[in-house]
């Protein structure tokens, strides 16, 4: 569900099973890229989320569990990388978990 919090619109997850969010990204140069997720976690405990970095053919290039720490009422950043050099092209970043209730995402920055 999209809603505004502190003048920023984010995607907020409620109760449910098998929650996910996906971003489509494009890169220009062959290099390792930083992936920075702008998120909020209001649950009072860290939430583990499976992150997959997928190429245009559907091949998973990186799969990792990211633990999003609690962020009482504030947007914070969580960083990881593509893990390896990737070529210019189109990719997907997929975050999924059994339960993402209390977790929200505002943006994904790729640098």
Q: Where do the PLM segments sit?
A:
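Extracytoplasmic
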Residues: 1-111
């Amino acid at each position: 569900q999209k809603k505004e919090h502190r003048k920023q619109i984010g995607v907020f997850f409620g109760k449910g099973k098998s929650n996910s969010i996906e971003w489509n990204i494009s890169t220009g140069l062959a290099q390792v890229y930083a992936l920075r997720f702008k998120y909020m976690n209001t649950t009072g405990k860290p939430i583990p989320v499976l992150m997959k970095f997928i190429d245009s053919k559907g091949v998973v290039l990186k799969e990792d569990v990211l633990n999003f720490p609690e962020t009482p009422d504030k947007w914070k950043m969580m960083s990881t990388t593509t893990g390896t050099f990737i070529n210019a092209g189109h990719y997907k970043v997929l975050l999924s978990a059994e339960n993402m209730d209390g977790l929200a995402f505002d943006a994904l920055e790729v640098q």
